[in-house]
């Protein structure tokens, strides 16, 4: 299968039809907008990948230091890529097709504001990696206002035992939330303030922006899986969080309406864009899409994504999980019939550290790192802390530094590569340990694994041995998010039923834990945690 490079615009007559299951000549176009890559994938009526087209997402960086680092995306460039890539795969659709449905999944917490009347952007998209609000978040976290919120949460939880108040006890603002990045941007932009006063400013993450563009501004919506990661959505109330909005003086009137993730038509793309109207049957956050694409949809199912960052997700069913250690209670997806929640822990630096190591010349290609790591001694006395973006769950230290600890004159490149891969596994184990402390997980039969970095056999085997659980890698591991968006969009179109999803998800290699390796890795993990302590609060 190759990346399509056709640029011809497809002109088709997509019949609306009725939602009869298993239409043999129906397709789903799933678009996955990640941090570094945007890809459009064409799936057939059996949810098999028929073709795809992809491109790099261009990030614009500015700022002289980490504290003021700005990371942005040109919205016009992104929308042009979106349309072009979708058209690339549409040329492979039969002219007499019954229906084409679209599913969209996107990186979370990258946002933009625009004039609701003209769709004119007020600024570039502000990436989740952007640090412009880092100092503001720190000031707020030290403020009496937030301390009062934490104390109030503790008191109310003591008397009510409600999970919502338990979460409030530990609530902290982090830069990845959209709240303060938007407020900083609003303070810098007089045009935005005028639009707010006139009631014309629209705010949205990538999903909301795309739907507005596809419908020429007619539809202004978001959905809970994307909204729940922003920091201004209350998963316990299943609505925008009035308390937080009022505390930080966030202009609530700029927020989009909330709709479902899938199960019904969310919007219909204007026919002028793709040559015919296309129904959008699903939209959601990328990690939730990957969760569904891995076949993890029942309570207790576990998924690990290894991509730009590492994400560990546990499906919690009908109830959100209230955590004291930075495990996030998120909406997995919402349909007209029900809502499903997921608990998430993350580590920001996975492929990031591998790309950095490659740039230093530690290896020629990421594909060879598995064999290189295998060639290094098992008891290498070297430790790596993957903290270019700080240390997230469960440590939650934005000021941690990245470091090799234990370098010696006889340290080799192979040792360094092995240590880097082990550090990714150690972060997963750290998160997993906290999950086990806070949640009754019961017997977990298998963990599903996906993401580009999961192609690394050494890393998957290390995770399996360390967690002492089987790890099952899905087929087409780099496409799991697109697959999830396609599966949900196909449900909306009636192409398959929920009880058929398991048969549509294909799994690949199964990694089983090694008892000897488990003992050695546990010992090394203890030393690694000691090394980590030396890197915490480094930039304070």
State where each predicted segment sits.
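Short, structured active-site "lid" loops
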Residues: 73, 279-280, 471-472
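Glycine-rich phosphate-binding/catalytic subdomain of phosphoryl-transfer
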Residues: 67, 84-366, 529
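Broad, structure-driven detector of short, well-ordered beta-strand segments within folded domains
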Residues: 29-31, 69, 304
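Glycine/Thr-rich phosphate-binding loops that ligate phosphate moieties of nucleotide
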Residues: 2-58, 64, 100-142, 316-540
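Phosphate/oxyanion-binding active-site loops and adjacent basic polyanion-contact surfaces
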Residues: 74-82, 421
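Conserved non-catalytic scaffold segment of RNase H-like nuclease domains
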Residues: 65-68, 72, 76, 88
């Amino acid at each position: 299968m190759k990346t399509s490079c056709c640029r011809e615009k497809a002109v088709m007559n997509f019949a609306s039809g009725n939602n009869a299951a298993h239409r043999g000549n129906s397709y789903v176009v799933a678009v996955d907008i990640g941090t570094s890559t945007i890809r459009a994938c064409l799936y057939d009526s059996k949810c098999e990948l028929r073709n795809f087209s992809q491109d790099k997402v261009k990030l614009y960086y500015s700022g002289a230091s980490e504290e003021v680092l700005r990371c942005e995306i040109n919205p016009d460039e992104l929308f042009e890529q979106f349309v072009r890539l979708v058209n690339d795969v549409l040329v492979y659709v039969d002219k007499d097709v019954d229906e084409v449905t679209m599913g969209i999944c996107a990186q979370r917490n990258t946002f933009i504001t625009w004039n609701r009347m003209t769709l004119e952007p007020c600024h570039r998209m502000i990436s989740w990696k952007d640090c412009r609000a880092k100092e503001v978040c720190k000031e707020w976290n030290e403020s009496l206002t937030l301390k009062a919120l934490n104390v109030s949460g503790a008191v109310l939880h003591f008397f009510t035992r409600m999970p919502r108040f338990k979460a409030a006890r530990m609530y902290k603002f982090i830069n990845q939330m959209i709240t303060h990045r938007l407020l900083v941007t609003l303070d810098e932009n007089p045009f935005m303030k005028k639009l707010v006063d006139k009631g014309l400013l629209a705010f949205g993450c990538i999903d909301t922006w795309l739907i507005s563009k596809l419908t020429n501004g007619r539809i202004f919506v978001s959905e809970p899986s994307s909204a729940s990661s922003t920091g201004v959505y209350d998963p316990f109330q299943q609505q925008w969080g009035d308390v937080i909005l009022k505390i930080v003086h966030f202009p609530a009137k700029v927020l989009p309406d909330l709709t479902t993730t899938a199960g019904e038509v969310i919007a219909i793309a204007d026919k002028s864009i793709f040559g015919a109207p296309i129904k959008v049957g699903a939209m959601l956050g990328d990690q939730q899409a990957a969760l569904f694409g891995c076949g993890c949809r029942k309570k207790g199912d576990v998924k690990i994504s290894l991509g730009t960052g590492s994400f560990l997700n546990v499906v919690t069913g009908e109830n959100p999980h209230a955590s004291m250690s930075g495990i996030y209670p998120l909406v997995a997806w919402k349909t007209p019939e029900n809502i499903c929640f997921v608990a998430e822990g993350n580590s920001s630096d996975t492929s990031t550290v591998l790309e950095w190591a490659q740039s230093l010349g530690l290896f020629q290609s990421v594909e060879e790192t598995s064999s290189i790591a295998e060639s290094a001694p098992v008891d290498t006395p070297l430790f790596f802390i993957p903290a270019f973006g700080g240390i997230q769950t469960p440590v939650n230290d934005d000021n941690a530094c990245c470091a090799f600890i234990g370098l010696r004159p006889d340290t080799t490149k192979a040792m360094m590569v092995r240590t880097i891969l082990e550090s990714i596994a150690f972060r997963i184990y750290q998160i997993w340990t906290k999950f086990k402390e806070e949640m009754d997980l019961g017997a977990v039969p298998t963990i599903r694994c996906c993401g580009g970095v999961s192609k690394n056999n050494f890393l998957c085997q290390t995770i399996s041995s360390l967690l002492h659980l089987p790890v099952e890698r899905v087929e087409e591991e780099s496409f799991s998010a697109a697959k999830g968006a396609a599966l949900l969009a196909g449900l909306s179109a009636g192409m398959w039923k929920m009880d058929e999803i398991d048969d549509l998800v294909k799994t690949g290699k199964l990694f089983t834990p090694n008892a000897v390796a488990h003992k050695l890795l546990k010992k090394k993990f203890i030393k690694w945690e000691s090394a980590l302590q030396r890197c915490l609060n480094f930039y304070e």
